[in-house]
Amino acid sequence: MSNSKPEFIGIFGGTFDPVHKGHTEIIKNLFELIPLDKVIVIPNGIPPHRQASVSSEERLKMVSSAFKSSDTVVIDNREIKKKDPSYAISTLRELIEENPEHSLVWIMGSDAFAEIDRWYQWEDFIKMINIIVMVRPNHEIPMESVAYKLLQKSHTIDKEELSSGKEKILLLKIRPIEISSTEIRNKIYKGSDVSEFLLEEVNELINKGNLYQ
C-alpha cells in the first residue's frame, strides 16, 4: 500500500501537431484557476481518418521539449505507443487503475465537449470522471446538443467538487488562443516565420527536421 499523498490530477489530451504557445498558456491558466497538483499531457495517436503531418514520435518529442522545465506537467506516451486506435475511455480506465488514491479530472475544449456523444462509449466515460470544459469567450454549447443536456444535469460552479466524486462538469473561461496548429502548419508550408507562436525548443526541432514542409 502506497503512502503517497493523494493528489488532484488533470488529464489533458491533444494531437499537438505541433504543440504551440497556446497549449502551454492553457496549462498555465489551469494551474492558476484550479488547485491541481499536476497535469498529465497525453499526445493522441493520429485518428484513422486523418493523414499524419509528421510522425507520432516527432510530435511526442516536441511536446516533451515544450514542457521539459515543468515539475508539475507529466508527458504520457501511452496513446502514441499503441498501434490500434486509442479511445479516451480506454486511457481513462488505465489512469484510474494506476492512480487509485488520487483524484482525476478530464480537461477538454468546448468544441470537443459539444460533440461528446460522438465519443466511443461516451455514456460510460462521463460516469467515470469529473470534467473541466474550457470555454472560449462568446462560445456557447448548442442548446439542442447532448452536451447541453449533460450540463443541465451535471454542471457545477464549485471547483472543490471536482476533486471528489464523479459526473461533475465545470465550465472554465480561459483566455482565447490566438493561433491553431492547423494555421501554424499552413504558415510553415508557405515558408512564413512562425517563431512567435512556438517555444524556442519546438521551433528548433521543426527547423532541424524540416517538419511540415
PLM features: residue spans?
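Nucleotidyltransferase catalytic core that binds NTPs
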Residues: 1-213
